[in-house]
């Protein structure tokens, strides 16, 4: 399969993630959209690694997956803490720094 197909798929995934970040106000949806954008970036790294035959793209993708897992765990913990204290996870309704 040509590498361009992977790049088009990555662009579509990144666009869907960006659309979710720009239009949704639910914190969980925002986190999922950011994860989708990170996976699109990983797919791009892997596509270029496949084209060049280099393993650096695979190493970068593995590192990004590890960082994304840590980011998701911390983000989910923050969302749960905010929900327990405020009763909402909508980013427009929650103003953590003002109180």
Swiss-Prot record:
It is an enzyme of class 7 (translocase). Keywords: Cell inner membrane, Cell membrane, Membrane, NAD, Quinone, Translocase, Transmembrane, Transmembrane helix, Transport, Ubiquinone. It catalyses: a quinone + NADH + 5 H(+)(in) = a quinol + NAD(+) + 4 H(+)(out). Its EC number is 7.1.1.-. It is found in: Cell inner membrane. It is a multi-pass membrane protein. It holds the Pfam family Oxidored_q2. GO terms for molecular function: NADH:ubiquinone reductase (non-electrogenic) activity; quinone binding. The chain crosses the membrane at residues 2-22, 28-48, 60-80. Belongs to the complex I subunit 4L family. NDH-1 shuttles electrons from NADH, via FMN and iron-sulfur (Fe-S) centers, to quinones in the respiratory chain. The immediate electron acceptor for the enzyme in this species is believed to be ubiquinone. Couples the redox reaction to proton translocation (for every two electrons transferred, four hydrogen ions are translocated across the cytoplasmic membrane), and thus conserves the redox energy in a proton gradient. NDH-1 is composed of 14 different subunits. Subunits NuoA, H, J, K, L, M, N constitute the membrane sector of the complex. This is NADH-quinone oxidoreductase subunit K. It comes from Anaeromyxobacter sp. (strain K). The gene is nuoK.
């Amino acid at each position: 399969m040509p590498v361009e197909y992977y790049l088009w798929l990555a662009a579509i995934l990144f666009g869907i993630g960006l659309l979710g970040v720009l239009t949704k106000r639910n914190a969980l949806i925002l986190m999922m959209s950011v994860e989708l954008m990170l996976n699109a970036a990983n797919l791009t790294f892997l596509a270029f690694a496949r084209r060049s035959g280099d393993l650096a793209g695979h190493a970068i993708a593995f590192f990004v997956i590890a960082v994304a897992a840590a980011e998701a765990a911390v983000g989910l913990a923050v969302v749960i803490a905010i929900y327990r204290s405020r009763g909402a996870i909508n980013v427009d309704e929650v103003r953590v720094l003002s109180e």
